[in-house]
Amino acid sequence: GGYLASAFACQYPERIASLINLSNAPNKLPDEEVITRKKIICLVEAQGYTGITLARIKTFLDVSNHSNTLIIECIKAMDSDFGGNVLLQQLNSTTLRKNLLPQLFRLNIPMLFCFGDSDLLVNKAIIEQLAKTNACIKQQRFDHCGHMLPLEQPFLLAKALSFFIDSKLN
């Protein structure tokens, strides 16, 4: 969702008043993640989809949440609701992507990037550098959090979002 929202903002900047991006840096994915996704696509196309594995779930979570059954079961339920066809569509449409950061950097709108300190899919250094060099861009790093920010730190995320929205209104 974050990459698509960023792409929309770049394509139609006149329609966007602000941008909030959770657990996403709108740039290329790490090579390792691209390889993993391509393997998943091949496997699902060849053998069908039987659901997300615990090992894959753990790659999205901070180590402190590896045994949090509430979060793990929630991820499994979301995965089950969407199924293999939606997974394939998502992976095929979001794996190979261009770097949108230079375009976003030129937009003159308030932006907030929120990410976990142990999120393996977000290039945190790039977001932090952008926030240092562009006053429109704010970033919020969440401790003890991986890629599943809304599940791992829901209250702190709600507070950060509320603060960002309130600051835009005042």
Task: Identify the meaning behind each predicted range.
Residues V44, D79, D119, G146-L149:
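Glycosyltransferase donor-binding loop in the core domain
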Residues E128-I137:
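Active-site-adjacent alpha-helix of alpha/beta-hydrolase-fold enzymes
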Residues L29-E32, Q47-R106:
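Conserved alpha/beta-hydrolase catalytic His-Asp/Glu region
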Residues G1, A5:
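Gly/Ala-rich beta-loop-alpha elbow adjacent to hydrolase catalytic centers
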Residues L120-I126:
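Conserved alpha/beta-hydrolase "acid-adjacent" motif
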Residues I137-N170:
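Catalytic active-site module of serine/aspartate enzymes centered on a nucleophile-bearing elbow/loop
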Residues S6-L54:
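Flexible "cap/lid" loop of the alpha/beta hydrolase fold
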Residues L107, F113-F115, D119:
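Short beta-strand/loop motif that positions the catalytic acidic residue
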